[in-house]
């Protein structure tokens, strides 16, 4: 399984640590989405920014439709 992560809110006004996590996930702004591996490290990053992103599990063959 992989995780599809979509940014639903802007990171303007967020602390620097949160902005770095969003950048580390590969998200560029509201509406952008990426497919990442379902590993403990990515899960931890997503957990820290759950208020800014939407997450869903997808099959292994999925790719990102927007970057």
From Swiss-Prot:
Entry's Gene Ontology BP terms: translation
Ribosomal protein found in the keyword field: yes
Transmembrane segments: none
Top-level taxon: Bacteria
Annotated GO MF terms: structural constituent of ribosome
Keywords: Ribonucleoprotein, Ribosomal protein
Subunit structure: Part of the 50S ribosomal subunit.
Family statement drawn from the similarity comment of this UniProt entry: Belongs to the universal ribosomal protein uL30 family.
UniProt cross-references to HAMAP family, sorted A to Z: Ribosomal_uL30_B
Descriptive protein name: Large ribosomal subunit protein uL30
Recorded name of the encoding gene: rpmD
């Amino acid at each position: 399984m992989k995780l599809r992560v979509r940014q639903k809110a802007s990171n303007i006004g967020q602390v620097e640590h949160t902005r770095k996590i969003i950048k580390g996930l590969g998200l560029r702004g509201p509406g952008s989405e990426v497919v990442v591996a379902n590993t403990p490290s990515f899960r931890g990053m997503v957990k820290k920014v759950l208020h800014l992103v939407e997450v869903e599990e997808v099959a292994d063959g999925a790719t990102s439709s927007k970057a």
